[in-house]
């Protein structure tokens, strides 16, 4: 049966969505899911505390079928009582399997909105980009160092009065005296606290209001108009002004892309500010008590506890707001913001949270990222059936779409297909006999292996798989040794080299998977980078180093005789074709760097790359019949008296002859090229 969910998407979640992940309704009508207490386990009976970060009522029982009271699920025959028997009426814990603690979530209702540190303090900052404000200004606002003055409510306010009805001149002595007196006289009164809550905003609440007031489509149209203005504007000639224009254009592109993504995914920008904080399932942040009484706990638990401590303190201050100075509430909001920042990325905080020994606590970012993170360590590197792994080595004689698969790996991967082929041919009576035959590695099995491998693609994967070229399909051929042979041109897509890198081999089983691998994932169909569109299969490193000595010149061509005392020993030989030149090289009559005259097809479109536009002949010879022989530095032409070309010879080397033949054969589509 196919799974219901075929894919998953990583993105921003709304507060309602986070609550929906965690909230459940008990048969009594009680809604559970909110974590309100920072306690973990009771030291008396070693049971999770109620409404704590390990609560059995929220996350499920520790033991299957056992509630927090220690009662077991009762077996009832009446269907009406069966629903009531699924949970304990005293403690509210459901009688379900303990594995639910691996995926049941909780949530913390924050007393104030806090900004998500990944979207605020990363570079580039998404919040700063979409608001088009300096990052430092937003950080001061998020951490309650600055206040946002404006019409927070829909009612007329002191700072929200229109200029037509209220004009405030800074030079007016009346307003300069009355406003400071107003703030000073009411700064410790309940009315002032109410005024501050209505007129001023700070912390995540202020940023949330700014994001909520954004009209994305209007901003998108404004960016489009401004971009047209800069496109039609010619360079000013001033280096500084042109640089500022370029930076502004780059910023417009970033902001336009970000807004477009928000519109396409139907995501609200204010979701980058958190009011509901999800709590991970307990099994993903375990807390273990050893035999000697020592407790080992995940750092995430301590970070959650600090958030709940500070959030509960802020709730108490807000409930007693009449008697609590506004400055104390603002400081507590800042502490909640810093605690949530430490949960997501402790390294970004100005004062990272540590344990009693001064060690930095590991946050979500530390657990997820890197080679030892959750994705690369536990999810991407899992072992699966019909797969293998080995070191890669260069296979320069292989075509681009083929790879050399070691015989030992091929025999193991294609074993089911070989068993079926052997039974269909009546070579063995049963599967067991076929496996025994394969273990003995009888000689005729290699022919069967080649038959089942023919036309069956394999997938090569090199971790980390950062883009789609990290997994490509190849046609396998048997190779000696225990290493996978790979064409050097495909290494750029894998970001691989031949210094000990390893690759995983996967075998597509179904016909659909084989067709997809052959049509979409074959290496010869993935020649362009998906990110930039530039060619990715280009020669580099060893290939360029090999082409250089193959095509290098070591003497002075036809001028070599000037510097040689024995001209007869330095005469340049003539060859009629590629084969003649390569045959002379194989007989060691010439070497790779020896100059030679190679006959070229007679054509009116002979193009010789030269530093001069029109090269003058070095020497012109005439015979009694009126035929001319013009000798140039890089070629020579024989013509009759009517200026009709009789023959053309070009000056080249044996190495360049080999290189040209290989390029010509590759362009004509030959799959096998004889090495020289």
UniProtKB/Swiss-Prot annotation:
Required cofactor(s): Mg(2+); Zn(2+)
GO biological process terms held by the UniProt record: DNA-templated transcription
Binding site for Zn(2+): 67, 69, 88, 91
Top-level division of the source organism's lineage: Eukaryota
SUPFAM superfamilies per the UniProt record, alphabetical: beta and beta-prime subunits of DNA dependent RNA-polymerase
Main localization category: plastid
UniProt remark on cofactor binding: Binds 1 Mg(2+) ion per subunit.
Pfam families: RNA_pol_Rpb1_1 (PF04997), RNA_pol_Rpb1_2 (PF00623)
Cellular component GO terms, alphabetical: chloroplast; DNA-directed RNA polymerase complex; mitochondrion
Example of a GO MF term: zinc ion binding
Keywords (A to Z) from UniProt: Chloroplast, DNA-directed RNA polymerase, Magnesium, Metal-binding, Nucleotidyltransferase, Plastid, Transcription, Transferase, Zinc
Assembly description: In plastids the minimal PEP RNA polymerase catalytic core is composed of four subunits: alpha, beta, beta', and beta''. When a (nuclear-encoded) sigma factor is associated with the core the holoenzyme is formed, which can initiate transcription.
Function recorded in the entry: DNA-dependent RNA polymerase catalyzes the transcription of DNA into RNA using the four ribonucleoside triphosphates as substrates.
Protein name from the UniProt record: DNA-directed RNA polymerase subunit beta'
Native species: Huperzia lucidula (Shining clubmoss)
Lineage of origin: Eukaryota, Viridiplantae, Streptophyta, Embryophyta, Tracheophyta
Gene name linked to the record: rpoC1
């Amino acid at each position: 049966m196919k799974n219901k969910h075929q894919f998953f998407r990583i993105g921003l979640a709304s507060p309602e969505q986070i609550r929906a992940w965690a909230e459940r309704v008990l048969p009594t009508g009680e809604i559970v899911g909110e974590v309100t207490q920072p306690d973990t386990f009771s030291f008396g009976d070693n049971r999770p505390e109620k409404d704590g970060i390990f609560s059995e009522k929220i996350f499920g029982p520790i033991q299957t079928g056992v509630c927090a009271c220690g009662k077991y699920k009762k077996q009832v025959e009446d269907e009406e009582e069966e629903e009531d028997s699924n949970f304990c009426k005293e403690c509210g814990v459901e009688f379900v399997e303990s594995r639910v603690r691996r995926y049941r979530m909780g949530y913390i209702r924050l007393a104030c909105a806090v900004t998500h540190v990944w979207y605020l303090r990363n570079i580039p900052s998404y919040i700063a980009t979409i608001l088009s404000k300096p990052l430092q200004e937003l950080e001061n606002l998020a951490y309650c160092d600055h206040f946002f003055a404006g019409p927070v409510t829909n009612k007329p306010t002191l700072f929200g009065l229109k200029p037509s009805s209220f004009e405030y001149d800074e030079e007016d002595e009346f307003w300069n005296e009355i406003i400071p007196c107003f703030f000073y006289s009411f700064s410790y009164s309940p009315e002032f606290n109410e005024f501050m809550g209505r007129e001023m905003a700070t912390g995540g609440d202020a940023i949330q209001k700014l994001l909520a007031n954004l009209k994305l489509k209007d901003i998108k149209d404004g960016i489009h108009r401004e971009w047209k203005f800069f496109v039609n504007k010619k360079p000013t000639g001033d280096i500084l002004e042109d640089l500022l224009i370029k930076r502004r254009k780059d910023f417009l592109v970033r902001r336009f892309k970000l807004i477009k993504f928000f519109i396409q995914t139907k995501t609200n920008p204010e979701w980058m500010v958190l009011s509901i904080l999800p709590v991970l399932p307990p099994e993903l942040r375990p807390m273990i008590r050893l035999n000697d009484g020592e407790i080992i706990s995940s750092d995430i638990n301590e970070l959650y506890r600090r958030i709940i401590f500070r959030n509960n303190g802020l709730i108490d201050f807000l409930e007693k707001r009449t008697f609590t100075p506004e400055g104390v509430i603002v400081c507590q909001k800042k502490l909640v913001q810093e605690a949530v920042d430490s949960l997501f990325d402790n390294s970004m905080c100005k004062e990272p949270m540590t344990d009693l020994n001064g060690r930095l606590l590991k946050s979500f970012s530390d657990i997820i990222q890197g080679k030892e993170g959750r994705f690369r360590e536990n999810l991407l590197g899992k072992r699966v059936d019909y797969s293998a792994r080995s070191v890669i080595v260069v296979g320069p004689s292989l075509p681009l779409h083929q790879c050399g698969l070691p015989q030992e790996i091929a025999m193991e991967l294609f074993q089911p297909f070989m068993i079926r082929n052997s039974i269909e041919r009546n070579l063995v009576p049963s599967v067991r006999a076929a496996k025994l035959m394969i273990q003995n590695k009888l000689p005729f099995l290699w022919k069967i292996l080649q038959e089942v491998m023919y036309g069956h693609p394999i997938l090569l994967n090199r971790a980390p798989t950062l883009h789609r070229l990290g997994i490509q399909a190849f046609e396998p051929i048997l190779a000696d040794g225990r290493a996978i042979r790979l064409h050097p041109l495909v290494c750029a897509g894998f970001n691989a080299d031949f210094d000990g890198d390893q690759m995983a081999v996967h075998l597509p089983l179904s016909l659909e998977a084989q067709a997809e691998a052959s049509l979409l994932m074959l290496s010869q169909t993935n020649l362009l980078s998906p990110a930039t569109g530039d060619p990715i299969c280009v020669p580099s490193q060893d290939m360029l180093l090999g082409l250089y000595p193959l095509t290098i010149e070591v003497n002075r061509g036809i001028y070599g005789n000037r510097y040689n005392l024995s001209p007869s020993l330095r005469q340049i030989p003539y060859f009629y074709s590629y084969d003649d030149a390569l045959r002379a090289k194989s007989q060691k009559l010439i070497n790779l760097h020896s100059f030679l005259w190679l006959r070229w097809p007679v054509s009116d479109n002979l193009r010789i790359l030269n530093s001069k536009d029109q090269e003058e002949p070095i020497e012109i010879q005439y015979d009694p019949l009126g035929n001319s022989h013009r000798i140039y530095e890089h070629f020579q032409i024989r013509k009759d008296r009517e200026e009709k070309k009789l023959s053309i010879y070009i000056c080249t080397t044996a190495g360049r002859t080999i290189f040209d033949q290989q390029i010509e054969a590759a362009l004509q589509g030959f799959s096998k090229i004889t090495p020289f």
